Amino acid sequence: MMIRFRKSQETDSIIIYEMASTSPGRIQINKKTKEIQILDSGDEDPEELKFIVKVYLIENDYPDQYTYAEG
């Protein structure tokens, strides 16, 4: 699985990432509560996607771009 995340919007409290995998999707993160909302999971499992977002985006201080590769 290869997912590329790209920050597409950011406000004081919310970040939206677009993702590219076999089908594109979008996620939203509340910076204050760290709540993850899957706007469109594409073809990825939503629960696995939330885990990936927590580990790779939230814990890495919301990078502008990130590539996740498993395997």
Where are these regions (language model features)?
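N-terminal acidic leader/helix
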Residues: 2-34
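Acidic, low-complexity intrinsically disordered segments
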Residues: 26, 31-71
